[in-house]
Amino acid sequence: MMISGVEISEKSGSAVFRLKAQPRSSKSAISGAYNGGVKVNLKAAPVDDAANRECCDLFAKVLSVSSSRLTILSGKSSKNKTIKVEGLGAEEVALLLRPYL
């Protein structure tokens, strides 16, 4: 499913989408769509997994789920990541992300 330039797929009842993280930003926020994924600015530096934790916490808040339901499938040490949201389908995630895109 494509929403505002972001591809969200569904695998085994979980939504999966890509993102590009921009660490060391002035504030943490979703800043729109980027190359088929979500662009997100993070205050945290990419040290000791801090930026990954902040990324999961931000999306947990936006999607109204526990951060334990978010998993970084790929890109833990990269700016380009693939995120899985357990318990939410692609359509639900699309509706919740739409205001930020």
Swiss-Prot record:
HAMAP family: UPF0235 (MF_00634)
Family: Belongs to the UPF0235 family.
Pfam family, one: DUF167
A cellular component annotation (GO) from this entry: cytoplasm
Record-linked PANTHER family: UPF0235 PROTEIN C15ORF40 (PTHR13420:SF7)
Record-linked InterPro entries: DUF167, YggU-like_sf
SMART domains, A to Z: DUF167
NCBIfam families listed in its UniProt record: DUF167 family protein
Protein name (record): UPF0235 protein Cpha266_2081
